[in-house]
């Protein structure tokens, strides 16, 4: 595994976004860990984002992270459509939700199938997940 930080990470994100031949996109999903680091700053400065949907797990630490992310997104004046609660790896169905300042768009519940999900071979399932997200937008 390669650990990139600061300018190296920002440069890689910039190169990916500028050198990729994008077709007309309706949606672009950017999967990132929670936070407010260099990747977020680069994406908000370099990409012309029209909206953001955040994803979080229903626990106190994740809610603390997403609140910081919400503040950062607001500083860049990018509209937040809402958030999705990702509970697919948590078998505790009674995990309480904390109230956030943005709309809750939906929730993915625990799935035994997701524990063994193989993105390379289960691409149809990955498409279904994306379609579920888009249906709530």
What are the roles of these predicted feature ranges?
Residues 1-26, 113-123:
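P-loop/Walker-type NTP enzyme "switch/lid" segment
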Residues 13, 32, 45, 82, ...:
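Glycine-rich phosphate-binding loops of nucleotide-dependent enzymes
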Residues 32-40, 63-65:
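Short glycine/serine/threonine-rich phosphate/pyrophosphate-binding segments
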Residues 48-85:
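Helical hairpin unit composed of two closely spaced alpha helices linked by a short loop
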Residues 70-137:
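C-terminal lobe/tail of nucleotide-utilizing enzymes
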